Amino acid sequence: MAMSKIMSLTGLLASASLVAGHGYVSGVVVDGQYYGGYLVDKYAYSDNPPETIGWSTTATDLGFVDGTGYQSPDIICHKDGKPGALSAEVAAGGEIELQWTEWPESHHGPVLNYLAPCGGDCSAVDKTSLEFFKIEAKGLIDGSSPPGHWATDDLISNNNSWTVTIPASVQEGNYVLRHEIIGLHSAGQKDGAQNYPQCINIKVTGGGAATPAGTAGEALYKDTDPGILFDIYSDLSGGYPIPGPEVFSA
């Protein structure tokens, strides 16, 4: 085989590896019960996919939404996101373990979690009507040596999973949990940040009285936000400003 063909094949294989390595949330565990998510690399090609708690998406390349899509509906629950038909039941104050298929070590960045009340059955909600409040965010953990140790590194070390606690004070009801990784490996340049939003439907039981104010998905970020336009390969001693609204505090 000619050298040019070998190099071309190597490049294609490397590209395929990068795409396959992004991953997605394949399911969650609540109180020991497993709920399957939307398996985009399988169900998107099926005429009759099973009903799940996970939102469907057309992101079959396991790709991302960048700054050019921050004011489009794709940033809400990924590309062409549509509500799942089912919901996972979780007690207020309970934990949800979100299981990723995989995540590439090089894609350092924060992990963020939001809730938005559906005002009814989440399976029929208009995603553009959802208003999200942030319940958790973790970013740079150790910046002593660039590119630093990030929340994504903890996710990887925890068998590609992330556990989030549902605030005990929120009202019971139906919510969309928006779980997101922002890859910052190319974020030193405009529109280089890579957002990977993943949405699931949950039903919170036994909650309190809190009804936090929310933000529309298309207003969560700007492509010039300090935590979006950020060079992880420079001096990190100043820390990292996590983008989006402040974390809700009861």
Swiss-Prot record:
Its main location: secreted. The keyword Oxidoreductase applies. Its EC number is 1.14.99.56. Disulfide bonds join 77-199, 118-122. It is found in: Secreted. One of its GO terms (cellular component) is extracellular region. One of its GO terms (molecular function) is monooxygenase activity. Keywords: Carbohydrate metabolism, Cellulose degradation, Copper, Disulfide bond, Glycoprotein, Metal-binding, Monooxygenase, Oxidoreductase, Polysaccharide degradation, Secreted, Signal. Glycans are attached at residue 159. This is AA9 family lytic polysaccharide monooxygenase E. It comes from Aspergillus tamarii.
